[in-house]
Amino acid sequence: MDNVLPMDSDLFPNISTNTSESNQFVQPTWQIVLWAAAYTVIVVTSVVGNVVVIWIILAHKRMRTVTNYFLVNLAFAEACMAAFNTVVNFTYAVHNVWYYGLFYCKFHNFFPIAALFASIYSMTAVAFDRYMAIIHPLQPRLSATATKVVIFVIWVLALLLAFPQGYYSTTETMPSRVVCMIEWPEHPNRTYEKAYHICVTVLIYFLPLLVIGYAYTVVGITLWASEIPGDSSDRYHEQVSAKRKVVKMMIVVVCTFAICWLPFHVFFLLPYINPDLYLKKFIQQVYLASMWLAMSSTMYNPIIYCCLNDRFRLGFKHAFRCCPFISAGDYEGLEMKSTRYLQTQSSVYKVSRLETTISTVVGAHEEEPEEGPKATPSSLDLTSNGSSRSNSKTMTESSSFYSNMLA
């Protein structure tokens, strides 16, 4: 197929076909300037925002929770993808010439798949954690060590999935330019290439979103559709509201990811249906737009955290306190709110099955941090996102529920 826009260095599914020596995809300067400004916004916002998210969590002891460790992994993957791939993708799509050599050609085809896999499965892990915390609150939670092991396994699987595309990546020198492409093994009807691309799309988009959708649907029904007992205390209502805020924030994160990446996946599946589309000159603008939307997903999460979570908002205000239009706020609250451990007796209503479990509680907080004080063996440590530590002693009386702000 001649005159195909060479997408072979793009994130993943490539059209590994013959490319012409001429370059028909030449844009006017004003278009390049506009696209450059749009992509610059992504890189700056994503890298700065995600680095601040990582700092907020790792620099504050009480923010080191199971959920937040997965958010660190998500932020790391997105910051790296924005820093190492967005600009290169843009320059190659605009000029249709590969300037970066063989090694970076392999890395450029390899790393984004791994980063995208790590991102979506970090969201899946958070959804599973929310599901277990709210639907099965008496089940043991992941420890800090187990959480790190899960993150390590996610990256190992991500690297294995991305390996074939990096391995078969190569550069090809033409009389007028160099292109980065993927030379898949010869096979009738490009079977290996099609199988790999479909497998990748399912594993890093459709499958995890299906799992996440199921988890949050069940959690949403539990938190919003079930009635709260009329005699529940104000503290208990606050606790349920806190759970809802966490779930709502993560649903926004996942929906943003799904919307941003859908056009990109569709774009790379279309050639298997109608290959002639890649012969059209307008396809370059379609690609730049779909890639911008996909890459922009890396910059939205820090904004979502800042808008929907009080602690992250405090952290961002402190990080940007040098800006004259930003008030630093009560920065001590980032630590203080999660360090209060009050002994109280609390009623826990299991709304999913309309059962009430009455327990003695020592210290209610968002999640038990990595190195936080441990509850006594006879206590049930309930958190504002529904998490719990077992070894409980059931009581026959209830009292107010003390809930902290969310992490």
UniProtKB/Swiss-Prot annotation:
Cytoplasmic side stretches: 55-64, 129-148, 220-248, 309-407
Disulfide bonds: C105-C180
SUPFAM superfamilies the record matches: Family A G protein-coupled receptor-like
InterPro entries per UniProt: GPCR_Rhodpsn (IPR000276), GPCR_Rhodpsn_7TM (IPR017452), Neurokn_rcpt (IPR001681), NK1_rcpt (IPR000046)
Membrane topology: Multi-pass membrane protein
Subunit structure: Interacts with ARRB1.
Protein name as annotated: Substance-P receptor
Protein's gene: Tacr1
